[in-house]
Curated annotation (Swiss-Prot):
Signal peptide: none annotated. PANTHER family: 50S RIBOSOMAL PROTEIN L3 (PTHR11229), LARGE RIBOSOMAL SUBUNIT PROTEIN UL3C (PTHR11229:SF16). One of the primary rRNA binding proteins, it binds directly near the 3'-end of the 23S rRNA, where it nucleates assembly of the 50S subunit. This is Large ribosomal subunit protein uL3. GO terms for cellular component: cytosolic large ribosomal subunit. InterPro entries: Ribosomal_uL3 (IPR000597), Ribosomal_uL3_bac/org-type (IPR019927), Ribosomal_uL3_CS (IPR019926), Transl_B-barrel_sf (IPR009000). Part of the 50S ribosomal subunit. Forms a cluster with proteins L14 and L19. One of its GO terms (biological process) is translation. Disulfide bonds: none annotated. Belongs to the universal ribosomal protein uL3 family. It comes from Caldanaerobacter subterraneus subsp. tengcongensis (strain DSM 15242 / JCM 11007 / NBRC 100824 / MB4) (Thermoanaerobacter tengcongensis). The keyword Ribosomal protein applies. One of its GO terms (molecular function) is rRNA binding. Residues 131-165 are annotated as: Disordered.
């Protein structure tokens, strides 16, 4: 059965395996989450569970959201996300989802919002080559050609140009679960994941794992 959980990024560190080789890892506080709503094919057109994570004061929520949580009989949560599943019979509203749904050796996909870098040029944003730095060159780091002349007489959509960099939804696929700590709700995965410390992460079964 497919699995999913919400978490919060704690940061990166390194651990050693049985051979003494160092492994760069990311520590994630995963769960506990609670099922707030079930969606079915008959009523909603698809099967899914809505999951809440992170407690929040009632003062910070509007009336529709407060009513949503009261109907489910759960305390208000900061984050709400959906997981589409083929079979939701194992979940009921109020069911708690903990980090122990995963075990070492599992493969997961981690989704988050990447760090924002602000307005950036094409060299930083896309790795473009700079222009000549001497001999009378009038451009160094700016964009080169943006297209042809009279025909087509415009710059095509998708042309790589300066703009805001980062703050994108990014998914890192097929990360290995190195360690699971049910007591502290910690999930340790090999490699890096998107976003700054404290940012929301969505952890799912990997679509590439067999």
């Amino acid at each position: 059965m497919k699995k999913g959980i919400l978490g919060k990024k704690h940061g990166m560190t390194q651990i050693f395996d049985e051979k003494g080789e160092v492994i760069p890892v990311t520590v994630i506080e995963a769960g506990p989450c609670v099922v707030v709503q079930k969606k079915t094919v008959e009523k909603d057109g698809y099967n899914a569970i809505q999951v809440g994570f992170g407690d929040v004061s009632e003062k910070k929520l509007n009336k529709p959201l407060l009513g949503h949580f009261k109907k489910a009989g759960v305390s208000p949560k900061r984050y709400l996300r959906e997981f589409r599943l083929d079979d939701i019979s194992g979940y009921e509203v109020g069911t708690e989802i903990k980090v122990d749904i995963f075990k070492p050796g599992d493969r997961v996909d981690v989704t988050g919002i990447s760090k924002g870098k602000g307005f950036a040029g094409v060299i930083k944003r896309y790795g473009a080559r700079r222009g000549p730095m001497s001999h009378g060159s009038k451009y160094h780091r700016r964009v080169g050609s943006m297209g042809a002349t009279t025909d087509p007489g415009r710059t095509f959509k998708g042309k790589k140009m300066p703009g805001r960099m980062g703050s994108d939804r990014v998914t890192i696929q097929n990360l290995e679960v190195v360690k699971v700590d049910p007591e502290l709700n910690l999930l340790v995965v090999k490699g890096s994941v998107p976003g700054p410390k404290g940012s929301l992460l969505i952890i799912r079964d990997s679509v590439k794992s067999k």
